[in-house]
Amino acid sequence: MFSIYHCRHLPIVALLLLLSALPPAAAAPAEPTLSIAEARTRPVGTKVTVEGVVSSPSGDFASSFSDEGFGLQDRSAGLYVSLKDNLKLAPPARVRVTGVIEDHTGLLALVPTNPADVIRLGPGRPIMPRAVKTADIGEATEGRIVRVAGKLSQAPESDGAYGFKFWVNDGSGAALIFVNTQTGITMGRLPSVGARVSVTGFSSQYDTHYEIDPRSPADIAIGK
């Protein structure tokens, strides 16, 4: 077996040649990139890497999520990326994120250890919302950008500093819409009960109930 001790009598050139022939130290294996659908099946506490397009701007849901995270979606599914730092990301930026799967009061979230775990890859394709029935907002839609259309079935209710909520029903069952204060959407913008409204937003969950979180005033269309 070769050892450095036995090399003291070798010419320096021969020693360098011999050392250069030794195999390099093995590099740490790179974290495999999963589809978001695959990542969503991993147990809480699992470290994963995903790539996707930002679906909601950084900090849009800060009043109820208590962080500065953003939505992320690929062709397979979507999820929420939870961060304390506002990275000022907006759709349709494309990013790679490494983090740990966590349950945030029912909502599946990917939590990076630090902001450097979010790598900007350039612009991506804008996400087209998935049209769904109001009764179908649930686990199958969670993390995606969705759109519902129906009648405003109940008057808006204030949720204090968190924002406010209202309900839309297309006849299949009411969907809860939660509006965070950062979005710039106000209660006064909504029509009266019974009027038609279309809502686009991030399909979310809080505790046992599912909801849609609009991202900006453009996500609410009256009379459609």
Place the predicted regions along the sequence by residue.
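Compositionally biased non-globular segments, especially hydrophobic aliphatic-rich helices
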Residues: 17, 24, 28-30
